[in-house]
Amino acid sequence: MFKPHLLAVVSRCNSFFGCVDICCNWGNSAPRTLKGLKSVTSEQVFEREQKYGAHNYHHCSAYRAKGVSLDMEGKRYFDFLSAYSAVNQGHCHPKIVNTMVEQAQRLTLTSRAFYTDVLGEYEEFLTKLFNYDKVLPMNTGVEGGETACKIARCWAYMKKKVPENQAKIIFAENNFWGRTLSAISASTDPMSYDELRPYMPGFEIVKYNDTAALEKAFQDPNVCAYMVEPIQGEAGVVALDAGYLTEVRELCTKYNVLFIADEVQTGLARTGRMLAVDHEDVKPDLLILGKALSGGLYPVSAVLRDDHIMDCIQPGLHTAMDVMDPRMRILAASRYYVRVARERCENAQIQATYLRKELNTLPKDVVPVVRGKGLLNAIVINKKFDAWDVCLNLCKPTHGDIIRFATTGHHRGTDPRMCQYYQKYH
């Protein structure tokens, strides 16, 4: 069974709401008798998942994540992963948890055959917040991407008059928006798409951050949309050049192509603005949100767009079984989180400046590049070093409260000294 060296946890950047802990461990320490802890070790957790679960992840164990957190052995860790930006506000936010429990005790599930008192309230709040006419809620981030693609194709045939079965959607090289067949059909990572053919037709790739290549692709009159992440997280936190999104907006308008912004990871203040596209004050035709949208308690996504695009979706064409049920109450609660997120944008910028300043003190022969925006950041490890070996060195047992990392590839990470910073100021 795969077991990394002793113990390690986490990469990417932590919550902009301060230092919120998550309990994780790679190790085999004996269980401690602590109030509220199960009598089970991390080793037992690993073995059970290895035996009964699909082997699609190498991960840590976690028992509790709230405030000061504990793992199976009672160890405490700082969460610099934030569930890939799904828990920007921290784990188990009490207001959101309490609201969801309250709703679950009242009504848990209906279908779209019924109205509820929550959905319209949520839709009004979200559309007014981001200045769109309509929102289509879904369950997961990848469903948000799928929904945006379906809307784009409908718009292509109904409004742009693209010939039947000829609509094309352009994606940026090294994109990542999920693991469905549609998402992997847009991928350029062999680990995502190998041995899963045939792929979705009508998807084409252009180089990321290259407006000349994009304009050349737009010469094809059958191109109906361009989907892009303002910062490519899975590719290694790769940000676009300043001015790129402004040019994309201009090109999409010029060639009558829909601009789709995938803000599943970057949205809701992660980059220091409510949306990453806000750094250039551009408005996409379709906006995809997810992850932190629910406050980290439930898979929820949303696609926002204006009426002239929304009108292409007719009754029966697209829905989801569970997405409209009263669990939307959690989204009503998440309005509190979104409001706080707006207030915390400036705080994210302040913390990010400090973080990158400290990261830039790392040895340049090992870490030549530090990149990111707001509190979505990465370090690039020199290719002559093996990233795993570097992490093992970082993971050596230390005294005190130094963070230990878990990472793969030649990017991602953070600085142990951030522990001291957050202990001092939070």
Swiss-Prot record:
The keyword Secreted does not apply. The keyword Transferase applies. Its cofactor is pyridoxal 5'-phosphate. GO terms for cellular component: cytoplasm. It catalyses: a 2-oxocarboxylate + L-ornithine = L-glutamate 5-semialdehyde + an L-alpha-amino acid. One of its GO terms (molecular function) is ornithine aminotransferase activity. One of its GO terms (biological process) is arginine catabolic process to glutamate. Its EC number is 2.6.1.13. Keywords: Aminotransferase, Pyridoxal phosphate, Transferase. Belongs to the class-III pyridoxal-phosphate-dependent aminotransferase family. This is Ornithine aminotransferase.
